[in-house]
Amino acid sequence: MENQSLIHREANCLSRFDRLPVKSEMLKIIAVLAAVSVVEAFDLGLIGQTVLVLKQIWNLGPAETGLLATCSTIGVVLGTFSCGFLSDRYGRKRVLFWAVFIFTVFTFMGPLMENFYWVVAMRFLSGLGSGAVFPIPYLYISELVGAKQRGVTFAYCNSILVLSYVLPSSFGAWAVATFPLEVAWKLPFLVGG
């Protein structure tokens, strides 16, 4: 009988939460999460343009080109796996802050490296941060937004993320057309960092 009362109270609490309106504080948090997604998407997408330029400048073979193109994705996978454990242990806000810090610093350091292997290392470490960032906005939305607005909010945030993947390619194409290749490959990293 006592268990039923506890379950009933929890169900009432959840249904009350779902009826709460979206307030300005929630919108601010969602806007920050969307901005983080834009920066993360830029960071992940910048390698597509960069790998073609570095292949030409550094005379990279197929194995090196493949490693450069995938090293950040490998980092993302490992970072995503660690996100849940770290968020439960240290809190989502703290993990989000440090993950953004990690991918920003290592992205910014990428063009400062003049060696292929150091650039690969920077991209891998940046990917670890990006991977830890990726699930957190979805977790926050599922907790902050009531059931009636949750689907629309997910759709908006996902649309922003997907549209943001266009930014690094556009910026990279402009940089390659405007600057010498030795400079052009560095610019997306500096902007993304």
Where in this protein do the model-derived segments appear?
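Transmembrane-helix signature of 12-pass secondary carriers
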Residues: 1-193
